[in-house]
Amino acid sequence: MEWDTVIGLEVHAQLKTKSKLFSGASTAFGATPNSQTSFIDAGLPGVLPVLNEQAIIMAIQFGLAIHGTINDLSVFERKNYFYPDLPKGYQISQYQKPIVTNGYLNIQLGNNLEKTVHIARAHLEEDAGKSLHDAHTDYTGIDLNRAGTPLLEIVTTPCLYSAEEAINYLKTLHQLVRFLGICDGNMQEGSFRCDVNLSIKPKGSSVLGTRTELKNLNSFRFIEKAIAFEQARHQDILESGLSVIQETRLYNPDNNTTQAMRGKENENDYRYFPDPDLLPIHIDKEQIEEIKNNLPDLPEAISKELKNTPSLNDEDINFILSSPDTYQYYKKIKSLCSAADKTIINWLKGQYAAFLNEHTLTFETPPISAKTMAAFLSKIHEKKISSSIAKNIFSMLCAGEEDIDAIIEREGYQQQNDNSALEEIVEQIIKQYPEQVTEYKAGKEKLLAFFIGQAMKQTKGKANPEQINLLLKKHLG
């Protein structure tokens, strides 16, 4: 029997606010357990939450970026459940009146296909604390540093039908929240986590099957493997004549399986009701318009613009959009530099990227400023230095030097463009290698690169390769 897989995703994006959603405690990652916990985060009686306005602005930014509806009235509600790392006994979230509804995100699939993923809602809520099972041998510790950190929960409709679609959507969403500047996207630190709701149904059926929820996945690779395992598990159960249990499961990467965590709750089980300590949020059109006018450049629009640059291919564009810092670095260089787009991107994704990887650096803290890199690439474009000399200069720039003209002067790197001097060198090379000349004239044209190499060797890389190329062709006939 053939089956259709149906997937809906819930992503928790941790917002890049300096303080928590309802308290002034810091959201910095990695602090000593419980050192960033206020009375509000700890759920002590007699304290009242105060809403972080920056979180509202970030949620509106996201809503605008996904073409969603920003609701003029939004309400916080208490989501009631018991868990050791939830000291209040409830989580402040949004249910009936979220801040954003009815958005979408376009994703790219194979064979140049595009799919629109419908986003049902995006709402604000506070994160829970963290249970530390390995910190002690005979009991579990609770760290409330994370409790109260603002999350934007982004919920799709069940409109994804394969692991490929799910991963492409998640990568596109991950890219978007980073370019918006609302989430750092650090999956290892839990800043971007995903719950997968999955069911299968007979192929072509309009009736959805019983779903299971895979909780707190924080790796694209693990998400893909968890979906594949859960698809196969559902299929085995149904083809054995049994029924899938609606439950929450955890993925175990050590043995690539999922295991039951608890029965899956329905929304009614949480007994949502409006939080009496928080006023409804009223958002006016003027505020939305102001935020819209200050949105940064976003990946979809940038990609369309870059595709109009004939010299850039998809690989180049993907590299430029690999992070907001990479894009901003490229954009700054392009604004200051006379070099062609392809020259810029070849250097950035070639030698520069290799250096960054080798030294565990990123374009967030580049070893060469965009201004210096632009000046360097302009020298190459203007043929003031050869490509081989450029590699030497680049190494010096990576080591901390900044004055390119001083390097050229000190090292004697000025490009040799004297036509008569270069012509003498070409004539000497032709006399020096008569056998290769005969082979070249017999049709072995690849030997031209050999002759150019000899000329560059004699001039210690200072000759203009294009001039050498023309002179060789002239003398070799």
Swiss-Prot record:
InterPro entries cross-referenced by the UniProt entry: Asn/Gln-tRNA_amidoTrfase_suB/E, Asn/Gln-tRNA_Trfase_suB/E_cat, Asn/Gln_amidotransferase, Asn/Gln_tRNA_amidoTrase-B-like, GatB, GatB_Yqey_C_2, Gln-tRNA_amidoTrfase_suB_CS, Gln_synth/guanido_kin_cat_dom
UniProt GO BP: glutaminyl-tRNAGln biosynthesis via transamidation; translation
Gene3D superfamilies reported for this sequence: 1.10.10.410
Annotated signal peptide: none
Molecular-function GO term, any one: glutaminyl-tRNA synthase (glutamine-hydrolyzing) activity
Record-stated family: Belongs to the GatB/GatE family. GatB subfamily.
Subunit structure as annotated in this protein's UniProt entry: Heterotrimer of A, B and C subunits.
Function, as annotated: Allows the formation of correctly charged Asn-tRNA(Asn) or Gln-tRNA(Gln) through the transamidation of misacylated Asp-tRNA(Asn) or Glu-tRNA(Gln) in organisms which lack either or both of asparaginyl-tRNA or glutaminyl-tRNA synthetases. The reaction takes place in the presence of glutamine and ATP through an activated phospho-Asp-tRNA(Asn) or phospho-Glu-tRNA(Gln).
Protein name: Aspartyl/glutamyl-tRNA(Asn/Gln) amidotransferase subunit B
Origin species: Legionella pneumophila (strain Lens)
